Amino acid sequence: MTFLLPRADGRDGVPRTVINLANHLVDGFDVEIIGLLRGNTEPAFEIDQRITVRHVMDVRPFGPDGERRNLSEGGVDEHGNAVTRKLLFERQQPSAVAPLDPRHWASSDQPLIETLRSVRSDVVVGTTPALNLFVGSYAPSGVAKVGQDHMNFVWRTRDQDERAMMCQGIQGLDVFVPLTMGDQRDYQELLPDATTWITAIPNALSWPIADRAAPVVDKVVVAAGRLEEQKAFDRLITAYAPLVASRPGWRLDIYGSGSEMPKLRRLIKQLGVGRRVTLRGHSNQMPAVLRGCAIFAMSSEREGFPMVLLEAMSVGLPMVAYDCPRGPAEVLRDGVNGRLIPDGDDAAFTAALTELMDSVELRRQMGAAALADAAAYSMPHIVTRWEAVFARLGVHPEPAVR
């Protein structure tokens, strides 16, 4: 089977979750990963050596020999002047097939089409709306065409053009796999006459589930994710600010990196909470970090499927999250494994944090429930669900391997 990614070497959640799945499917299937654009020499996430990896276009600014590449490959303009990769991307003409996705260019259309036509797998899996369009239109006949999406229905259908692209892409597939049951229902209602089978499968946990729940005694509220606009860490900091004075023994640690870091630093300084609110940067030891905390907080304005909540559940942390579209409500059971707060209600978010801060018994009770709920997102469970999809398409694991 072949997975098609915008970037096989990307650092965001899409390559992370797709590579995680591919690394486990390779035990029973021949697996290939194709990245549209190659921007780094090494992948950000470990890829099993049994998986074949190839890239459609190499946009690294430097080649293996350290020499700058030409414009078609990235790094210099037509006059030989060095340009940033951002500027180089901005100079590209939009794709004729998927003009709404800035990662697709007119110059990348034909190479991607030719790459798809060369695929010899039984199944091709697109992982974005744009890639689903290409899979549905250009994957070889006789190949099962599967599409994923890692963002929610509400966001994808927010305007007419986005909605049209989603509908066209889905209808060219044999199977479309959104991340949540809510998305499944919405797409089925949007496309009642589509022959495409629409069935939801969530992402799997990135690491094993802990044997026992975290002790939740250290007075640390933790958050993690890319420091980008959609994650809305500014509203988490704002909601936490009153607790700096009322619960002085506690602190808020935020892990991650991104373009919003300067803005968040300014907000922390403006609110005067720098002694108790810290931007910790990226960590490669998140399971250990989470086990040393007491509460997990998520403030996103929108999600496809909130992997950070699964990771908190996997170590038995109680959670507090806004009920943003669309994933938190499918993971977080209000009053059972955490608190689900009406989207945008900062006062209620602050109150929920306070409630958990003041009761270690409640933290342990909700943390134990979170740990039990994590089993539904274990990798073996999610792989079994994917295998059922492939079996319906006539593709089965090889007995000799399994």
Task: Label every PLM stretch briefly.
Residues R333-G335, R339-A347, T354-V360, A375:
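Conserved acidic donor-binding segment of nucleotide-sugar-dependent glycosyltransferases
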Residues D12-N20, K219, A223-P242, P248, ...:
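A conserved mid-protein helix/loop that constitutes part of the nucleotide-sugar donor-binding site
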Residues P318-Y322:
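Short hydrophobic beta-strand element within catalytic cores of glycosyltransferases
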Residues H282, E301:
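Aromatic "clamp/platform" in nucleotide-sugar-dependent glycosyltransferases that forms part
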Residues A348, E355, L362-A376, T384-A388:
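A short, well-ordered alpha-helix in the C-terminal region of glycosyltransferases
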Residues W105, G126-L131, D149:
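Short His-centered aromatic/hydrophobic patch
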Residues G147-H150, C167-A210:
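Donor nucleotide-sugar binding/catalytic pocket of nucleotide-sugar-dependent glycosyltransferases
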Residues L5-R11, H24-P99:
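N-terminal strand-loop element at the rim of the active site
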